[in-house]
Amino acid sequence: MPNISSSELIAQFQTALREGWGFIYGASGEIWTQAQQNAASREQTKKYGQKWVGHRVADCSGLFAWVFRQLGGYCYHGSNTMFRRYSSASGSLSAGKRTDGEPLKPGTAVYKFNASEGYHHVGLYIGEGAVIEAKGTAYGVVTSKIGSGWTHWGELKGVDYAEKACK
């Protein structure tokens, strides 16, 4: 797998944010069609998916899968597996900071974990306390704060984190 710079990763996530991507569970960068919306079976998609017709859509890990494809790499579509098998280094967060005292590097994946669902959500830390995430069907791709419930971090395999870290 080619090394992808963290700045390239961040730039692709910023593109999804700027273009107003939507969230559809299971998606990874395709344009959501009316036919897909009409056939939707998930309640959240039936309720909120109409506003994403004609937009690119992804779920949280699907956004990573799409970005890696654009940059010539590969990232598994599934946040649990991303954390467990595709992190070259990982650990816990407390109030948005690494518990080992090291700085969180821009381009690092951040996760939400609970005992019943495991690592059930993933976003990308972009620096200065901000995360870009595909948040949910009602929200689409948005920014959030690193201190807003993110519990773990993982530096992804195939990403060059040599650029300056942010405290």
Where do the language-model regions lie?
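Charged, often glycine-rich, active-site loop that binds/positions anionic groups
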Residues: S88-R98
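Short beta-strand segments that buttress and anchor functional surface loops
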Residues: G107-N114
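Short, well-ordered loop/turn sites that connect or cap secondary structure elements
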Residues: R98, P103-L104
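N-terminal capping segments
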Residues: M1-Y74, K105, G118-H121, I132-A134, ...
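Low-complexity, Gly/Ser/Thr/Pro-rich intrinsically disordered linker/tail segments
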Residues: S148-K167
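Catalytic Cys-His active-site segments of thiol-dependent hydrolases/isopeptidases
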Residues: Y76-G78, V122-G147
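Residues at the C-termini of beta-strands that transition into short coil/loop
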Residues: N114, K135, K157
